Design a protein with these regions (language model features):
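Bacterial N-terminal signal peptides that target proteins for export
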Residues: 1-8
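Short, linear, compositionally biased motifs with a strong N-terminal bias
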Residues: 11-14
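Serine-dependent protease modules
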Residues: 20-253
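C-terminal motif of bacterial Sec signal peptides marking the signal peptidase cleavage site
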Residues: 16-18
């Protein structure tokens, strides 16, 4: 009787263990299927957004330029003229004729201006138009290359708060830097260098730092929607509040 009981108990233990193992496999399989089913949708969204950002930067960055404002100074004991950098900023190619748009405060007071393209070629530039009341300036580079790349124009009147934006520029002299964010607000007012009020300005949380001035603000289609021009920051560095002049205003100048 004892042997029979012992055999019966062993059989029951083995049977229950097998059942438990099967249930565990089924449960784990179900969880794995759930994770696998959920993962592609999330990863696909992230990948699409990243791919969009990467593609925009790849296409737009060749149109972004480095603008250097220089002063000329004659040496005390020689007739040689020295070039003293007074400041720098960003600009972008407006058309294939070599017109460059930037901020007025980037080029103000310059005795010589140079524009460096993405291929590192440096070109002298002349000022052909300014609108201090809008903090805008237009330059023309000498001997523009045939392969100058421009930016497609968007319509800033169609912007909505929350839309994705991208800023490309040269903050602190670090050329071709990309930052991203959203449209934080529309219709802001800021002061131009002429102390006149610029209305209808775009506010964004995309990082804009000294050196970004004059660079393009783009939408998720890679279209130009604004010119980065100012930040609100007690420290002078980005505090998540940047401003851009709408492209529709630029087109009117």
């Amino acid at each position: 009787v004892t042997r029979a009981l012992r055999a019966f108990l062993l059989f029951c233990t083995a049977f229950l263990g097998a059942c438990s193992s099967d249930d565990s496999v089924i449960a784990n399989s179900a969880l794995a299927d759930t994770r696998d089913a959920d993962a592609p949708e999330y990863l696909s969204f992230a990948t699409q957004d990243e791919a969009n950002t990467t593609e925009i930067f790849s296409k737009a960055s060749p149109a972004v330029v480095f603008v250097t404002n220089k002063a000329l100074r004659r040496g005390l004991f020689s007739l040689n003229v020295e070039e003293i950098p007074r400041g720098s900023g960003t600009g972008f190619v407006w058309n294939k004729a070599g017109l460059i748009v930037t901020n007025f405060h980037v080029i103000a007071g310059a005795q010589r201006l140079t524009v460096t393209l993405q291929d590192r070629s440096e070109h002298d530039a002349e000022v052909i138009g300014v609108a201090p009341e809008k903090d805008l300036a237009v330059l023309r580079i000498e001997n523009p290359p045939d392969d100058l790349q421009t930016l497609p124009l968007g319509d800033s009147s169609e912007l909505q708060v929350g839309r994705k934006v991208l800023a490309i520029g040269n903050p602190f002299g670090l050329d071709t830097t990309l930052t991203t964010g959203v449209v934080s607000a529309l219709g802001r007012e800021i002061k131009a260098p002429s102390n006149r009020t610029i209305r209808g300005v775009i506010q964004t949380d995309a990082a804009i730092n000294p050196g970004n001035s004059g660079g393009p603000l783009l939408n998720s289609l890679g279209q130009l929607i604004g010119v980065n021009t100012a930040i609100y920051s007690p420290s002078g560095a980005s505090a998540g509040i940047g401003f851009a002049i709408p492209v529709n205003t630029v087109a009117e100048v």
